[in-house]
């Protein structure tokens, strides 16, 4: 008999010879149709068909857990591989990983040996995938020696698999299959092909084997997979909506920002975009002031010795930009925290002045490969709404709880109402003592629990210096965006020898909390553009009001209205072009102005305004003072 301990600490006994699937069907029947794999002792992930062979802590992985989702997507990649080889007998498979960002959730790189495959072939491949799903093949696993595996794949002419096997250090490899088809894989996989009910091939591109242009050019086919058709349909709806809402397209139409060939990955903010950028910064600055934050600014270029001291040199070197000044190495800052810590260290500190909260709109530069750049979502230069809080250890929980409240206040201001929260734990590449990591992680969990906020765990995805809370916001079409973070750091205060004098006169080490709510202003603006489809609420809109003249006779009246609105603090544009009013209206709709004032001789004679609200076709006649009062009320209530 073996003992399996569930997450709720209950212990179940399992007879020898039972598989994990047998165990779930007997002890956890409500999960039998959802279970995809199991994780033992927080580390080892196994197929449900594996036999229970030891006492373990066990987690059942379903599609809703990240590891279960990855198992599902990778199994769908195998489904694609099998379908392709059923249809294209000479096709050679290479690798088929799961991805977080891209035109799909998985892909398979395939050498079609001269056959041309295009998106027009997707229906044929999907039909073959459907046949495999309907056959409901059990997924089998076999462990063989490397020699056996090489001989097997040599007979099939699978040269890429042989190359992969040659690079595996262990003497045994695992093979997974469905029916007579099989593939080299370490697993795990779903229990049977029938689980993979809903899928879609989404894109195709070229890719070099091992990303080396001297190697063979392969065909990369992307796809997504879901447990139900409803979830797939929702995803496909999101994709179509996302195309309409693409912030790059809307940003161009509204003249918010651009990217230039002279600086790929570096945004150029146009006047309207700068208004939007400043609106976000000013709002957060005012909220920080209410909460006792002190704003600072740190240099963009600092000595490489600083980055070695902070640990960024070892952990972030490949993403940094370097320069030489007076024959010494310097770097553009990729993060703001070391500079902030130098400001803290510049003065002596007493326990009476802690917690000390510094805030900075800090511009950082990080090298990203050209191929992953994506509008405002993935750039090489951006501004973080960074805050670094230095506090005694016994203040950690209360500070974290205050930041949680602050974070949700900001998100709700922008119209977000649904959230998902995660705790990201210690990665393999990290710094600091085990006990500090355990204490910090426990404190983050307790803070969320006391606030009644449910959370998931992202194993090994914390920063190199500490665990973090990640805040995900759900936008208007149901997509989740990871934005804010709260990160606990014991490492940097140690590295910079930061201290304060406690009530007993002794020097103590503060804990450091890194906090960002937007994450970066650039990315958050990109999210807002797509969330609102460019139709911003009045208080942040860069195009609040456009005044359109019907005839040249009303130009002076329009200018008078324009000046009054400017003096009242509104963002106004005046269009007196000698164009038909219909053309002016169409142009204003494209720019997504909140209000159009259509002024003709009638409005001039009555000293009124014909007001057309965004998204409506009718106009209302308002007095000038009445319109201004309405705008002020709208902004106050937002």
UniProtKB/Swiss-Prot annotation:
TGS domain location: 1-62
Q: Where does Zn(2+) bind?
A: 337, 388, 514
Extract the PROSITE patterns matched here. Answer: AA_TRNA_LIGASE_II (PS50862), TGS (PS51880)
GO BP terms: namely: threonyl-tRNA aminoacylation
Q: Which PANTHER family match?
A: THREONINE--TRNA LIGASE, CHLOROPLASTIC_MITOCHONDRIAL 2, THREONINE-TRNA LIGASE
Per UniProt, subunit arrangement is: Homodimer.
Q: What name does UniProt use for this protein? A: Threonine--tRNA ligase
């Amino acid at each position: 008999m073996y003992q399996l301990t569930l997450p709720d600490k209950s212990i179940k006994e399992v007879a020898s010879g039972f598989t994990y699937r047998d165990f779930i069907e007997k002890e956890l029947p409500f999960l039998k149709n959802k279970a995809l794999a199991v994780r033992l002792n927080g580390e080892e992930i196994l197929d449900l068909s594996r036999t229970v062979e030891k006492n373990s802590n066990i987690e059942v992985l379903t599609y809703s857990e990240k590891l279960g989702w990855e198992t599902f997507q990778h199994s769908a990649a195998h489904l694609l591989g099998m379908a392709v080889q059923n249809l294209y007998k000479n096709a050679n498979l290479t690798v088929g990983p799961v991805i977080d960002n891209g035109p799909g959730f998985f892909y398979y790189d395939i050498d079609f040996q001269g056959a041309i495959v295009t998106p027009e072939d997707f229906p044929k491949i999907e039909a073959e995938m459907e046949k495999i799903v309907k056959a409901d093949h059990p997924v089998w696993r076999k462990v063989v020696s490397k020699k056996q595996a090489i001989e097997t794949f040599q007979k099939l002419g699978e040269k890429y698999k042989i190359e992969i096997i040659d690079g595996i250090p262990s003497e045994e490899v695992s093979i997974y299959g469905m029916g007579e088809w099989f593939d080299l894989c370490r697993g795990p996989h779903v229990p049977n092909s029938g689980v993979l009910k809903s899928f879609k091939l989404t894109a195709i591109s070229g890719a070099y084997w091992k990303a080396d242009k001297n190697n063979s050019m392969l065909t990369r086919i992307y796809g997504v997979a879901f447990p139900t058709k409803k979830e797939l349909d929702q995803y496909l709806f999101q994709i179509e909506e996302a195309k309409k809402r693409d912030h790059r397209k809307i940003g161009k139409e509204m003249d918010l920002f651009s990217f230039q060939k002279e600086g790929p990955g570096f945004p150029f903010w146009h006047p309207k975009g700068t208004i939007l950028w400043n609106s976000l910064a000013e709002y957060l600055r005012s909220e920080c002031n209410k909460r006792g934050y002190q704003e600072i600014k740190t240099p963009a270029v600092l000595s490489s010795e600083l980055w070695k001291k902070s640990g960024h040199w070892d952990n972030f070197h490949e993403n940094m930009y370097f320069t030489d000044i007076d024959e010494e190495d310097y770097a553009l800052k990729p993060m703001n925290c070391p500079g902030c810590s130098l400001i803290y260290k510049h003065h002596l500190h007493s326990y009476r002045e802690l917690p000390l909260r510094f805030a900075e709109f800090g511009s950082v530069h990080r090298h990203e490969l050209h191929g992953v750049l994506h509008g405002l979502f993935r750039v090489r230069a951006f501004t973080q709404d960074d805050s670094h809080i230095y506090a005694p250890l016994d203040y950690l929980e209360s500070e974290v709880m205050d930041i949680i409240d602050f974070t949700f206040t900001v998100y709700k201001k922008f119209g977000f109402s649904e959230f998902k929260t995660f705790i990201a734990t210690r990665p393999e590449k990290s710094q600091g003592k085990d006990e500090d990591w355990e204490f910090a992680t426990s404190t983050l969990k307790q803070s969320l629990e006391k606030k009644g906020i449910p959370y998931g765990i992202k194993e090994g995805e914390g920063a190199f210096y500490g665990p973090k809370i990640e805040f995900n916001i759900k936008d208007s079409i149901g997509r989740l965006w990871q934005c804010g973070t709260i990160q606990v750091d014991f490492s940097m205060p140690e590295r910079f020898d930061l201290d304060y004098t406690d009530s007993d006169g002794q020097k103590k080490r503060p804990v450091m909390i890194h906090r960002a709510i937007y994450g970066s202003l650039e990315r958050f603006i990109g999210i807002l553009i797509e969330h609102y489809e460019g139709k911003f609420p009045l208080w942040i809109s860069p195009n609040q009001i456009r005044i359109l003249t019907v005839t040249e006779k009303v130009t002076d009246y329009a200018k008078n209205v324009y000046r009054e609105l400017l003096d009242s603090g509104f963002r106004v544009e005046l269009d007196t072009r000698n164009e038909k009013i219909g053309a002016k209206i169409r142009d204003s709709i494209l720019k997504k102005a909140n209000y159009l004032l259509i002024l003709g001789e009638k409005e001039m004679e009555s000293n009124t305004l014909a007001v057309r609200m965004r998204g409506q076709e009718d106009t209302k006649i308002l007095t000038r003072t009445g319109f201004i009062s309405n705008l002020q009320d709208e902004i106050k209530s937002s």
